[in-house]
């Protein structure tokens, strides 16, 4: 698992998500879709109602690192 704070561009150790039920249902749906396709080929953005908050989710493994930007490769390989 890798977590990036896009604002500070730093890896994050812990994260708390507080979701409304509709957001949790949407997140589950996105995760199910990601599991059904090849890792790294797609990602999803989960936003709140006014788009002021966003969670981006994607699947990765060692075979698909080339699908990611250099920043994400560093995060995935070194957790930096």
Predicted region positions:
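Positively charged, low-complexity terminal tracts
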Residues: 1-80
């Amino acid at each position: 698992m890798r977590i990036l704070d896009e604002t500070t561009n730093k890896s994050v150790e812990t994260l708390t998500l507080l979701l409304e039920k509709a957001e949790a249902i949407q997140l589950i749906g996105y995760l199910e879709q990601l599991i059904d396709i090849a890792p790294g080929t797609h990602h999803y953005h989960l936003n709140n109602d006014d788009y002021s908050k966003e969670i981006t989710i994607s699947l990765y493994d060692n075979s698909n690192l080339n699908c990611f930007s250099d920043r994400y490769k560093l995060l995935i390989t070194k957790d930096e």
